[in-house]
Design a protein with these regions (language model features):
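Gram-negative (and chloroplast) outer-membrane scaffold detector with strong preference
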Residues: 28, 59-142, 201-212
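Short glycine/proline- and aromatic-enriched beta-strand/turn motifs that initiate or cap beta-hairpins
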Residues: 19-61, 208-212
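Outer-membrane beta-barrel domain signature
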Residues: 41-45, 86-88, 113, 149-154, ...
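Repeated loop/turn-to-beta-strand initiation elements of outer-membrane beta-barrel proteins
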Residues: 22, 64-68, 107-110, 168, ...
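Predominantly the C-terminal beta-signal and adjacent terminal strand-loop region
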Residues: 76-81, 157-212
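Residues that define the transmembrane beta-barrel architecture of outer-membrane proteins
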Residues: 20, 48-52, 89-97, 120, ...
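Sec-dependent N-terminal signal peptides
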Residues: 4-14
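Outer-membrane beta-barrel translocator domains and adjoining extracellular loop/strand segments
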Residues: 34-41, 80-86, 134-144, 189-195
């Protein structure tokens, strides 16, 4: 995990030379496993859980109202479960590439809403993430199993998302912000009768650097 985070920070430094804005996001995923067995039945004993979220990348302006953010993500999609006899937990890490279109409802330093030098901005977002498990464990009553070769977890996932973020300019070239996205992560490679998708609510804290 430390090596992965170091790599994400390295990508952040590299994007300074290429993008109009570069950003770092950290947050929390609140995930529900959408699992069906070979009979098409869901497992009611699987409960939602939370995990960390990291993203680095850069954003480009397409026109005054529309922008594109391209980033690398590391997301944990976790769950717990069990009954009177057994206890389960799933802890996973997925590495992905993400593109998000951002529609600016209003931007900082604009005159909208009568504020001549507003420090606040709001954007509505729609995007797609393509990701793959890099490590994961399932624990059953103290026994640990590797999920990276499990048919339901391995392979590529496609994750469409919708959300919004707000930002506040704190000094000339630096802004901070908060974001929320809802997404569903669909498994693309699983050919078995058992299917697993992830429903995810994500909260993010964003640090944005404007490039000259």
């Amino acid at each position: 995990m430390k090596h992965i985070l170091t790599g994400l920070l390295f990508i952040l430094v590299c994007t300074v030379s290429f993008g109009q804005e570069t950003y770092l996001s950290v947050g929390r995923n609140f995930t529900t496993y959408d699992f069906t067995n070979s009979s098409g039945e869901s497992n009611l004993n699987v409960q939602n859980s939370s995990g960390a979220s990291y993203e680095v990348g850069y954003a480009m302006k397409i026109n005054p109202k529309l922008g594109l953010a391209i980033g690398v993500t590391l997301n944990q999609y976790n769950a717990t479960g069990g009954d009177f006899v057994n206890n389960y937990s799933w802890d996973t890490n997925y590495l992905g590439a993400q593109g998000v279109l951002k529609f600016n409802v209003f931007k900082e330093n604009s005159s909208r809403w009568g504020y001549n030098n507003s420090k606040f901005g709001l954007s509505l977002n729609a995007g797609l993430n393509v990701n793959h498990i890099i490590n994961g464990q399932q624990k059953i009553n103290g026994q640990t199993y590797d999920l990276t070769e499990n048919d339901e977890f391995k392979g590529f996932y496609a994750q469409p998302m919708l959300g919004f973020d707000i930002r506040c300019q704190i000094i000339n070239d630096i802004a901070v912000g908060l974001g929320y996205h809802y997404s569903k992560n669909f498994g693309l490679s699983n050919t078995t009768d058992q299917k697993l998708n992830f429903n995810n609510n994500q909260l993010q804290f964003n640090l944005i650097i404007t490039l000259n």
